[in-house]
Amino acid sequence: MFRGFLLTICLLCPWAANSYELDSYSKLNHVDNYGNIDLRNKPYSSLPSGLVVKGNLNISKTAITKLPKGLDVGGSLEATNSSLKKVMPGVSIKGYANLLGSQIESWPKGVKLGGYLNLTDTPLKRLPNRLKVKGDLSVIRTPIESLPEGLVVEGNLY
């Protein structure tokens, strides 16, 4: 009975059975000459605190559920169709953040973002007051019911 249950879980969630934390050694296998880290479709479940990425960070289609405090991305963040649920305050992204189809429910206060914010097709319920987006903000097909007070969008609002 238990074996059948375990087999079913492994078949339904193949990434859960073989996922692990990205460490400083395995990170080297995914960095290109420009400082970009591409983890798309890789079996990682978490990122280390204080990770510094000189270029772009791509965690699309991964089991990574949270962006740790102190994460510094020198380029943009791609997290489309990922398991990402939580972004910790203190994360810095110099470019845009594309979270289309991720599992994010709220965008925290204290995240530095230098470009657009795409939250399309997410279970997003709220945004922080006085959020400033230096590009477009997309909340298409989200269950968000109202926009926060003091919202500033320098681009278009979708």
Please place each PLM-identified region on the residue numbering:
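Non-core capping and flanking segments associated with repeat-based/extracellular domains
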Residues: S19, K109, N129, K134, ...
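Canonical leucine-rich repeat
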Residues: S45-L47, L67, V87, E105-W107, ...
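N-terminal capping/linker segments that flank leucine-rich repeat
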Residues: F2-S49
